[in-house]
Amino acid sequence: MAGHDVQYGKHRTRRSFSRIKEVLGLPNLIEIQTDSFKEFLDTGLKEVFEDVLPISNFTDTMELEFVGYELKEPKYTLEEARIHDASYSAPIFVTFRLINKETGEIKTQEVFFGDFPIMTEMGTFIINGGERIIVSQLVRSPGVYFNDKVDKNGKVGYGSTVIPNRGAWLELETDSKDIAYTRIDRTRKIPFTTLVRALGFSGDDEIVDIFGDSELVRNTIEKDIHKNPADSRTDEALKEIYERLRPGEPKTADSSRSLLVARFFDPRRYDLAAVGRYKLNKKLNIKTRLLGQTIAENLVDPETGEILVEAGTEMTRDVIDSIAEHLDGDLNKFVYTPNDYAVVTEPVVLQKFKVVAPNDPDRVVTIVGNANPDDKVRALTTADILAEMSYFLNLAEGIGKVDDIDHLGNRRVRAVGELLANQFRIGLARMERNVRERMSVQDNEALTPQQIINIRPVTAAVKEFFGSSQLSQFMDQHNPLSELSHKRRLSALGPGGLTRDRAGYEVRDVHYTHYGRMCPIETPEGPNIGLINNLSTYGRLNKYGFIQTPYRKVDRATGKVTNEVVWLTADEEDEYIVAQANSKLNEDGTFAEEIVMGRHQGVNQEYPSHLVDFVDVSPKQVVAVATACIPFLENDDSNRALMGANMQRQAVPLIDPKAPFVGTGMEYQAAHDSGAAVIAKHDGKVVYSDADKVEVRREDGSLDVYTIQKFRRSNSGTAYNQRTLVKVGDIVEKGDFIADGPSMEGGEMALGQNPIVAYMTWEGYNFEDAVIMSERLVKDDVYTSVHLEEFESETRDTKLGPEEITRELPNVSEEALKNLDEMGIIRIGAEVKEGDILVGKVTPKGEKDLSAEERLLHAIFGDKSREVRDTSLRVPHGGDGVVRDVKIFTRANGDELQSGVNMLVRVYIAQKRKIKVGDKMAGRHGNKGVVSRIVPVEDMPYLPDGTPVDIMLNPLGVPSRMNIGQVMELHLGMAARNLGIYIATPVFDGASSEDLWDTVREAGMDSDAKTILYDGRTGEPFDNRVSVGVMYMIKLHHMVDDKLHARSVGPYSLVTQQPLGGKAQFGGQRFGEMEVWALEAYGASNILQEILTYKSDDVNGRLKAYEAITKGKPIPKPGVPESFRVLVKELQSLGLDMRVLDEDDYEVELRDLDEGEDDDVMHVDDLEKARVQQAKEAAELEKAKEEALDKTE
């Protein structure tokens, strides 16, 4: 028997074909959300308060200090928040200390600081009753970046940018004349020496002493001449910089000094953040810059005078490691003192080394390091700026390397906690201005923290972030996989990120550093491709927000692959050689082969095994969760695998889902961590279990109660239904499944079913990927899903009186009211169809437009028939189903309602949707299609044992798509069905073709895994043997019921008077320019005319046509379309004299065009005729009277 059995949870055993021993289990898949939020509550929030506070008033006589904060219990439970459309949030109380510096008085007070949304255990937030997710954002990391560019003459120039977390950018660049310039905050450029002089190093010799004598430095000094001898060089430089930053304002050296301090050296205005300081120190550190260079001077220990490295030595990694302590200490440290006019006058410590120029052995180049400022220094220092300039000048000498902005060492993730902290900081900064003003204006004696703090800006900032930020998204809740995937999403869009239109190919493309950090496959098709990514299965964030991936360490001394796991970021990994997880190992852990496949800085090639530093932890660490659920991924083309990963997220939860026969072993972990299942929090014994709740007695005697959700509406309108898995007496351990969630079976994710599939054509019905299906799948509810829709009706106070919910509706038959209760609300369990009343409601009508009959009724019956309009909530088009639940909210019950609303009624309607022609189906390999025909079971082809096939797919869908994984799944699935087992074939470590054929033989199938099929209609065998097997097929959310739409009478656009478009608006079908050409080509003039008039925008014509149809009269001629009038008016507005003439060349007023054909309008001639006729009739009547009188006489 190939493979070995693996237990997944307590309910499933699978035969696994994996060969690689995994030393590290998968981490919790939603920890990117939960850990980040926990860190925010533990330290992030405190840091934000400490950043902004203390606040002093303008005279510095009072100070407000932050002491601490406390989160109290949330007002609502999770369930209550969902029901009441409230947010799941906890009140936050902050303790402040107000110090009066004049009197020494200190007042300490706890201030309510608003309700703060709390993350649920599932990594989501409940905001206004809806479940939302904060998507992590992938942004460019703060730090210093160097780049090169080639101009049109082929000359290479260099550039550099210091990007802070917040604050002004500092840029350097060279031009075609080899002069180096700087730009401050995207303004006009100035020679870089001007900035050096402003920093207090004003002499040309000083500049050459710091940076060394290079062509760039000399050229720039020549360009930067002393223009005004009345000013010192430093003052002149300061004024020049001020003129660039504030053009048109009077320039003085003092104002320029304070401006530059505020721009770069004030921690409240300029913040590199911890990550920016880390990146800056890493880039400008002398150790990385000396690597590979030849030293041009003896390196002497400043304390002992011992020569550590002799001149002419190449600085290899071993040499640098041997003197690392000295490099981190005081080796070659020089102190420079700026002059008294400088922006910052403190002494500057630099580390300076002389190396041999790589491109000219006779020249010496100076390398300046920033001497590693402390990690807590968040603003720039003078040393940082000088070291950056040195690196930039060294690039022209061939020392140092330019940065790749798409490298994941230069992109970091802002997770929930950081995004929230940033919002909170914005709110506090707005509050700070407010507080400072109040402290200065009000009477100092009586002030308390409560009086001067206005929390509105803070609560508004948080509310705005959760409600309307691009990164706060409505959770994708189609199924557990889509939930999980959404929580692990990384978006490069959003505030401070990229925009779709400006993102080029490079940013979107797969980069070698994505390996093990971001999935190269799972990303949307369309405009967001490559901008929205997913975290790989093992990926996690370090404290700076860089993505790490785990590797097994190789002991270089013994050559053994150890079980020690090391997590590396992308730039750390660049220093090592990493072998693949499937490298063959001996029993003792050494490499079995001399040469192994490995990666180093993006180069995949063979390396001698003794050079390897690390080995991958698992083959699936490359891909994301959804991709890791595709069996035989290694046999699929990546484009189709992308579709497969994305379509699994669109699977609809079925009534009775089944886990796949052929899985990857990822199904258990994905279901467990998704948050959709009920998981045991502690060990214990089940003492009570039914469909609604499970009680577990812990070992310490306390009771855990787990509620089971039944048929709750998910965000996407599917049924969120959990099923209990345990019974009384069961022993459960922490982490065990207590109940399956939607799309789960036996503690595993189950997005679809395992039908018997044949690759064959049948009467052409599976042309173009269409799917032919057996009626069994409809009758047995195999692909039936439940969908819940929510409808609500509210009563408000209007000007004419309050609206009412009632049974007493005007002009409504008793038949229509039969399912309403005495209040006028539909009963639970009623079957409703389109147009049925769900909530009877009347609204008072204005008295002004009463007809004569109504006035008469008023006079007879008094005020009883006071006019009301029927504004009942009715079932909309396509909303048929069974009433599942009704919820009533009123002020009397203590429910919080919007102002002006007296009562709110919510009705939930459940629909049971069987699969039908037009629904979309898919496999896991990107093989999607639409159901084209549902064939009676007896007509379907059948196997030799009489089993009819369930689904027929077109074999032509395989070769050109190159997703061969589906064929392998098909055969292995049939073998699993025959053997009655479940199989796990993990990605990149799954069943080989030998394993597949061994299992096929074990199952007693034919050697080619094909079979003879018989035609269900004739009983004759088909000519050729057919591939038949079991394939996992899912039903997708794109259902025909949601798409099919037809319009008879509907709304029109106000401006164009044409029908609206789209199903949601009950719109019409667009008949565009090319469709008009088609009718013209056929000469179908009458059809064309009615399409352009009655059916579109001939306002009067369509009214008359409708009237004629209802009265059964012939349809009158059409009038003038509204668009013709619009066109005429448009041309007139351009100053063209446009007139409409009739056939006799008389001018016609546009408004008269319709009236001429109106039956109700009479002309003067007609009036004359009518008078004559009337007179004639009157005369005849008179004559008849006289004759009658005569007779009687």
From Swiss-Prot:
Residues 1173-1193 are annotated as: Disordered. Residues 1177-1193 have a biased composition (Basic and acidic residues). Its EC number is 2.7.7.6. The keyword Nucleotidyltransferase applies. It comes from the Bacteria. InterPro entries: DNA-dir_RNA_pol_bsu_ext_1_sf, DNA-dir_RNA_pol_bsu_external_1, DNA-dir_RNA_pol_su2, DNA-dir_RNAP_su2_dom, DNA-dir_RNAP_su2_hyb_sf, RNA_pol_bsu_bac, RNA_pol_bsu_CS, RNA_pol_bsu_protrusion. Gene3D superfamilies: 2.40.50.100, 2.40.50.150, 3.90.1100.10, DNA-directed RNA polymerase, beta subunit, external 1 domain, DNA-directed RNA polymerase, subunit 2, domain 6, RNA polymerase alpha subunit dimerisation domain, RNA polymerase Rpb2, domain 2. One of its GO terms (biological process) is DNA-templated transcription. One of its GO terms (molecular function) is DNA-directed RNA polymerase activity. It catalyses: RNA(n) + a ribonucleoside 5'-triphosphate = RNA(n+1) + diphosphate. One of its GO terms (cellular component) is DNA-directed RNA polymerase complex. The RNAP catalytic core consists of 2 alpha, 1 beta, 1 beta' and 1 omega subunit. When a sigma factor is associated with the core the holoenzyme is formed, which can initiate transcription. Belongs to the RNA polymerase beta chain family. NCBIfam families: PRK00405.1, rpoB. DNA-dependent RNA polymerase catalyzes the transcription of DNA into RNA using the four ribonucleoside triphosphates as substrates. This is DNA-directed RNA polymerase subunit beta. It comes from Streptococcus thermophilus (strain ATCC BAA-250 / LMG 18311).
